[in-house]
Amino acid sequence: MSKHQKFYSNHSSRLQTWDYSKAGYYFVTMVVRNRRRSFGEIRDGVMHKTPLGEFAEQSWKRTTGLRPSMNIWLGDFVVMPDHFHAVLRIGVNEHNSSLSLHNELQTPGQVLFALSHPKNSFRPQSNNLASIIRGFKASVTTEARRTGVDFEWVSRYHESIIRNAGDLNFVRSYIQKNVKRWNG
């Protein structure tokens, strides 16, 4: 253990055996640093977005147009006061066709097979989930700086691989009810 490992954690929370350019459904959460409520506030069960919150929503909606070669589908998403949740699907495309299982939602057996056969090549992080998130976060950060808003994302993001229709339905329900459940 290096002398700094006990103070700093820089290991990835990503599933090491999964290729995030692979066709599949993903649930992502991005959080504003220090949980600052930069995107708005919730009053009486309704999210009232700031201009930056509105920009974040519009920026997310532009994702598919900015990356047409990735065959992205945007599912449910929600802008919350201090974070952002979204479901997206990366479809089979020119960047992942040799890696894909060619299934929208995979069976547990297919997922286990994919997890036991990790990719073993190093390459730049482009045309994958990380590049989508990086582009979105950069867009929102750039707008915040342009408009003088004191804003910063947490450097990482949380993701879950959605493995079946039950998981997808659970996540969709979670996102749809998020504003009503808010007790911030």
Question: Residue locations for each model-derived region?
Answer:
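Short catalytic/metal-binding and nucleic-acid-binding patches
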Residues: 1-184
